[in-house]
Amino acid sequence: MAIECSGRAGRTGGPGGPGAPGPDGPPPARVVPLLALACGSSVATVYFAQPLLVTLGERFALDPALVGVIVTLTQLGYAAGLLLLVPLGDLLDRRRLVTGQLGLLALALLGVGLAPGAAALLVALAAVGLLAVVAQTMVATAAALTPPARRGRAVGTVTGGIVTGILLARAASGVLADLAGWRAVYLVSAAFTAVLALLLRRALPAVMRSEGPGGAPSERPGGSGGSYARWVASTVTLFAREPLLRIRGTLALLVFAAFSTLWTGVARPLSDPPWSLSSTAIGAFGLAGAAGALAAGVAGRWNDRGLARRTTGVGLAVLVLSWLPIGLTGRSLWALAAGAVLLDFAVQAVHVTNQTVIHAVRPEAGSRIIGGYMVFYSAGSALGALGSSLAHAAGGWPMVTALGAAFSLAALLLWAATLRTAPPVG
């Protein structure tokens, strides 16, 4: 994929000048780290509520068995954004798309922070999910700005920012909620998101449009006049035609169902006796999964060396094993911390591998492919969130653990079943 860049001082010649970012040269040093920061901040908004579920449920009088709907609606909004907004990354100027969505995300966060009742809260959270998909457009942007030989590292760096954002989301959310109330979490995030929009407007190339191989314009469904509806529908067509995309998407659904099962459900046993932890302490457990950020970078380097299949298998095996210590949460917080480290490491290793592998299938359709893949991610997260709440109501933490382990084992078995198929899953 080539990137057309123009309108920036100091870049002349060719599509974007010899100093322009793209497959033939590295992006400016500050762009990928800034994209990583913005990705992490955007995705964090989806996870702020996790350590606050008990607080929000009590504040807005939600049934304990259905408190997971807070996360589920946010994830459903995210899924809608993946289908409706992410494909625009292959159609429009990505700089305007990224900065515009960040600005709207800031407004949605403001709406959450000022919500007067449950209905307004849930609508605003769905809007946050819808607009937080800007992170996936930024992943595709980072991949497009980087030469193929270094693309795995760039995707790993940006995905590492996402992982770090998820982890810090829980910790920061808990701390701010204890210090200034839960509303402060969303109001501070709204201001930070607005600042990032301004910074990226200055840092990204003035014009960024996807192109096909050899610099030709990227394929437009229905020709150059193809409608937006056809463009969105083409995402479904891509997954219907490419078995590798469907396999990797299903793996994402199962892996993130397991991920969401843990992080949606864990607030309840930690806030109940014998632990009775505060929001700050509950959020701090998200830091136990900091290994996930390390996994993102390691997986990116392994993928650049052609080890995607091995990375997938090891990651899924570790994911299954992580539920053994997680199941001991009622007896030991150290066991939960150890299990969270293993789970986050495994999930992010598989996630980075998935994104690197699927982008190579059709580079000129990178935004649509990543958007379609992340629909599976979001569906799995919504399934895990709702399933976790229902499982806890039915059988407590042991039932939640069993559900998460079942999702993880299903992913490992799917990967094993496809080892002898063509194309391989990694």
Question: Which role fits each region the language model picked out?
Answer:
Residues 80-118:
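Conserved MFS/SLC helix-loop-helix module at the cytosolic interface between two early adjacent transmembrane helices
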Residues 81-93, 295-308, 392:
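Helix-to-loop junctions at the C-terminal end of transmembrane segments
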Residues 190-212, 414-418:
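C-terminal membrane-cytosol helix-exit motif in multi-pass small-molecule transporters
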Residues 309-354:
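C-terminal transmembrane helical hairpin of 12-TM major facilitator-type secondary transporters
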